[in-house]
Structures are given as structure tokens and as C-alpha cells.
Amino acid sequence: MEAVDQHRRDGAARDDDVRRYEGARPVTEHPILFNEPMSAAARAGRKSQTRRVVRGESLNWLNLANFTPECVAQRENGFSPYGYDGDRLWVRETHIAYGRWETRYSAKKERDEWHFVDMTLETGREYRFDGEVPNAARGGVLPTWWRRPSIFMPRAAARTLLEVTGVRVERLQNISEPDARAEGVTIEGHHMRGYCAGAYRPPSIRAFHDLWDSLNAARGHGWDTDPWVWAVEFRRIGS
């Protein structure tokens, strides 16, 4: 009996060590690109999942017969570019910044290139997401407002911050109906057509199919290729 009690105490001590380790693990932040409709869906609470194509070393491991998707998704392996439970994602989206353009020499391309000088914060302004912007040409001396692509958004401009609540790796076509709805899809009339008559997939998955292909088919990762994807679950926590 004493040995059993000692075993339980040892197990409890190990559990405490794990909790202390997890509690001490620093929270990391990662940028993630969303288009405007998906950003709006996340802010409204209609989007709580996103799927992204698995690339690089992670994909190489998936091609090994003895390495499962569960292994690739484990925190200990550190493959996820989107973090793990408790980490944060800040959404990069199209935005409007205040600044000017100047030319800088690119040694890589061996020529001058236009470079945007972001002056939004230093001039006491805030980044915008709506409204008109002047149709100015690059090279103007005076700064003004410019619509900027999502890839160039700085962390300071982010208005949507998400906390990761789950990460896994799966085939794209394994998505369930609830997961498709959690992707924030918009179900239209043609997605409903034929469903009651036995259409193969539910409307939410058909809507997700269309959304996915609109973003990824031209890149060679369409629905029909059924790529490995990171399935990331999250909740909105602020900006």
C-alpha cells in the first residue's frame, strides 16, 4: 500500500512539473494573412478555424511512412508556423497607412526600387481600414494616405488578435460540416441545390470548397489535390 501511495505521489509531482513547465512557456505571436471577408468573420465571431497548406520540413516528415500527422502536429516537434495552444496570431490584412515613397538601391536587383516610408505612428495618426485614399502617384514629396497590401502590415496596425486553441494536421477533404461552418463560410443558394436529393457534400463543405479554390487553386493546391493542411482553431481576444 505504501508503494502505491508513493507511486501516486511521484505521479502527482510529475504532473505538477508539467504544469509548471507549461505555465512558464512564453507565449509567442505569429502573423497570419486574412482577406477582408475572413478578417471580418473572425472579428464577428463567425470564424474560429483556418486551414493552411503544410509546406517545407513538415511536409517532408509527412511523406515518411512511420511519421503520422499527429506527430507532426505535436508541440514538442515545433513544426507549426502558427504556434500551439495559448499562442497568439495577429491578423495581417489590407490597411491604409500614412507615409511617402522614396527610392532605395537594391543590391540584389542592382537597381533603384520604390520603398514606402510608413509615417503613421510618428505623425500621431492611426492606421485605417476603410475610407477613400488619394489617387497619388509614387514619388510625391508630401506624405499622404496609401492603401497597403496585407503582407506589409506591421504588428502595430493589427486590429485582430487571436488565441490559438488547437492545432492539428489533416487532409483538406477530411473537413467536417461543423469545421466548415467554423471557417466562416457564406452559404449561397447554389450550395444548397440538390442537397435534399442526396448531393454528396453538405452545403457548408461545398461553400468551403469554393472558398478554398478561390484562394489556392491557382497556386496548385486546389480542393481536388487534397493537400495536407494545418487546421488551426482560435478565439478572438483583442487587438
Where does each model-flagged region fall?
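Secondary-structure transition motif
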Residues: 2-239
